[in-house]
């Protein structure tokens, strides 16, 4: 049997590969080695590992690599620690191939640790342009990878121009669209039980609500506090029920979280519920029934495009990515954000 290793590092990476995990698990000639690492192990980012286990996937290895601090320095140090720890893990598991996702620093560690041991790497969602450190990581991982599964033709062409063998480049689309397709005709059900998850206002799911996902931008990480405050102010003044997901683990996320906590303490009478995480299908069903998605998550570019959900994309985090007509780009300005939502 071929030993296929998948590394899940965070909330979004699990959503990207859940259907792939199922396919490998069911295949009679494949063995799944599942490594869970990074923020997927931490309660402050929603304990993604618990969702993974509940879905029936038992991790083969759990690898702790994150250094606390959420700064540029700790991101670099976590990458180094990730290389050390994942190198040992790959050496012990001896996979035939390692599958890595997207463009985070954990992805860089995965690609280096496997390629230096002559273990082939398959990279999902390479070849895209965003202009931040993520793009540098993404293109570096492309050069460390042997097989490339990309979202669109532009990404495929870009990888081929980088010198990769076109026979090893596959336009597979975004794998999270598999999940979006599966929930396409489903509606929000009360069994999502949002009142028991997160803190803040109890959202009534059969009344209009917004969803917010806003993360710090790596080359603007020192402005994360101000960026979040601008969006918080806009949402608060709109006085519409809102489900707000905590930011990813990136440089600046501590400041983003601090801004949210200060707002939560000072603005008692608001209609926002802050949630760490939801299982992928529940999240997509929730999103599909919302008025729109606000923030700077790639979910707005990918899943929302497929599901036809309006998106107010704030700032530069998704600059360069292909997008549908459902996306409206705005700056970090309270009035502009409010007008775009309305």
Please state what every model-predicted region is.
Residues 1-342:
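Nucleotide-activated sugar donor-binding and catalytic core shared by glycosyltransferases
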């Amino acid at each position: 049997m071929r030993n296929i290793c998948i590394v899940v590092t965070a909330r979004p990476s699990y959503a990207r590969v859940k259907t792939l995990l199922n396919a490998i698990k069911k295949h009679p000639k494949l063995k799944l080695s599942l490594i869970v690492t990074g923020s997927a192990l931490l309660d402050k980012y929603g304990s993604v590992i618990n969702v993974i286990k509940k879905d029936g996937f038992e991790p083969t290895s759990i690898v702790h690599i994150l250094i606390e601090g959420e700064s540029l320095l700790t991101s670099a140090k976590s990458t180094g620690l990730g290389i050390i720890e994942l190198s040992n893990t790959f050496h012990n598991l001896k996979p035939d191939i390692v599958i890595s996702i997207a463009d985070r620093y954990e992805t860089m560690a995965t690609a280096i640790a496997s390629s230096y041991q002559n273990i082939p790497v398959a990279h999902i969602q390479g070849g895209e342009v965003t202009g931040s450190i993520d793009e540098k990581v993404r293109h570096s991982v492309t050069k460390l990878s042997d097989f490339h599964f990309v979202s669109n033709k532009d990404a495929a062409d870009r990888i081929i121009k980088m010198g990769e063998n076109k026979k090893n480049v596959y336009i597979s689309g975004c794998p999270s669209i598999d999940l979006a397709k599966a929930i396409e005709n489903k509606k929000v059900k009360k069994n999502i039980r949002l009142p028991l998850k997160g803190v803040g206002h109890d959202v009534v799911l059969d009344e209009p609500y917004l969803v917010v996902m806003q993360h710090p931008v790596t080359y603007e990480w020192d402005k994360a506090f101000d960026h979040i405050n601008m969006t918080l102010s806009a949402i608060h003044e709109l006085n519409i029920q809102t489900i707000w997901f905590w930011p990813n683990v990136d440089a600046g996320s501590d400041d983003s979280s601090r801004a949210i906590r200060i707002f939560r303490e000072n603005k008692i009478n608001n209609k926002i519920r802050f949630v760490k995480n939801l299982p992928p299908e529940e999240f997509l069903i929730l999103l599909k029934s919302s008025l729109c998605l606000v923030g700077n998550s790639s979910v707005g570019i990918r899943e929302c495009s497929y599901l036809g959900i309006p998106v107010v994309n704030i700032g530069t985090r998704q600059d360069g990515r292909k997008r549908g007509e459902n996306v409206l780009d705005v700056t970090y300005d309270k009035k502009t954000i409010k007008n775009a939502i309305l």
